[in-house]
Amino acid sequence: MARLAAFDMDGTLLMPDHHLGEKTLSTLARLRERDITLTFATGRHALEMQHILGALSLDAYLITGNGTRVHSLEGELLHRDDLPADVAELVLYQQWDTRASMHIFNDDGWFTGKEIPALLQAFVYSGFRYQIIDVKKMPLGSVTKICFCGDHDDLTRLQIQLYEALGERAHLCFSATDCLEVLPVGCNKGAALTVLTQHLGLSLRDCMAFGDAMNDREMLVSVGSGFIMGNAMPQLRAELPHLPVIGHCRNQAVSHYLTHWLDYPHLPYSPE
């Protein structure tokens, strides 16, 4: 029996309308009744996730910013990882050949250079939103991550530019087909989950995890039981062909799987 369950949010636990379904909330409550530790592992900001947990009265550990921060049940900071100032400066000041919008994150929030109302649709559940700033005046010493949002083909070309400029000084990953992230070296959800399990006195073999994008890859391969969403990025499924694929987030597939796991642990599972 797993002792910890780690969940990506967008494309995994959240439905396409960016809400948590009632079946999902009920299943999370059942896991807690079984003394299974809940962990939300997401690219979203800690401030937003703490608000969501409070609104839902959920007790869960948080891995946020794709592993840049880990918080306890009480909100205590257990781990932090920031971009080096010179890396943040290069990414912010360089003229990149891209149409993608740039977004900067630190402990105070989410910052960008212009209004992009369409991006806020993903945050209707929490009301979290960006702050408009002159990105060239952003303090460089506390940037957790920088991400670019836009067309996937454009982001793929940008990824090549970033690799050429940064080399091994940053970790690049797609958290969605339309979002490319620049993270500290060695920073990912899997590394953050390792920190958390050590804090809790658990083994990664004691954990299960669910995800749908390339920023979930390290987490999914490190745990005892990793599960890929039916709506996952094709790249993730191609890289991890040995992991089981469950249903679509629109059908609350994580809840569907876990209900079977809780009620019929010895029977084979079908996502249908």
UniProtKB/Swiss-Prot annotation:
**Catalysed reaction(s)?**
4-amino-2-methyl-5-(diphosphooxymethyl)pyrimidine + H2O = 4-amino-2-methyl-5-(phosphooxymethyl)pyrimidine + phosphate + H(+)
The kind of enzyme this is, by top-level EC class, is hydrolase
Q: Which residues cross the membrane?
A: none
The record's keywords, sorted A to Z, are:
Hydrolase, Magnesium, Metal-binding
Q: What is its EC number?
A: 3.6.1.-
**MF terms in GO:** 4-amino-5-hydroxymethyl-2-methylpyrimidine diphosphatase activity; magnesium ion binding; nucleoside diphosphate phosphatase activity; phosphatase activity
Cofactor(s) recorded in Swiss-Prot or TrEMBL: Mg(2+); Mn(2+); Co(2+); Zn(2+)
Top-level taxon of the source organism: Bacteria
CDD domains membership: HAD_Pase (cd07516)
Gene Ontology biological process: antibiotic catabolic process; thiamine biosynthetic process
Task: Answer whether the UniProt record assigns the keyword Magnesium to this protein.
Answer: yes
Q: Where is the active site?
A: D8
Q: Does the keyword Hydrolase apply?
A: yes
Instruction: Report the pH profile.
Output: Optimum pH is between 6 and 7.5.
Question: Which residues does the record give as Mg(2+) binding sites?
Answer: D8, D10, D212
Record note on cofactor:
Magnesium. Can also use other divalent metal cations as manganese, cobalt or zinc.
Protein family according to the UniProt entry: Belongs to the HAD-like hydrolase superfamily. Cof family.
Record function comment: Catalyzes the hydrolysis of 4-amino-2-methyl-5-hydroxymethylpyrimidine pyrophosphate (HMP-PP) to 4-amino-2-methyl-5-hydroxymethylpyrimidine phosphate (HMP-P). Can also hydrolyze other substrates such as MeO-HMP-PP and 4-amino-2-trifluoromethyl 5-hydroxymethylpyrimidine pyrophosphate (CF3-HMP-PP) to give MeO-HMP-P and 4-amino-2-trifluoromethyl-5-hydroxymethylpyrimidine phosphate. This hydrolysis generates resistance to the antibiotics (bacimethrin, CF3-HMP) by reducing the formation of their toxic forms, 2'-methoxythiamin pyrophosphate (MeO-TPP) and CF3-HMP-PP.
UniProt-listed NCBIfam families:
Cof-subfamily, HAD-SF-IIB, PRK15126.1
State the protein's name. HMP-PP phosphatase
Gene this protein is translated from: cof
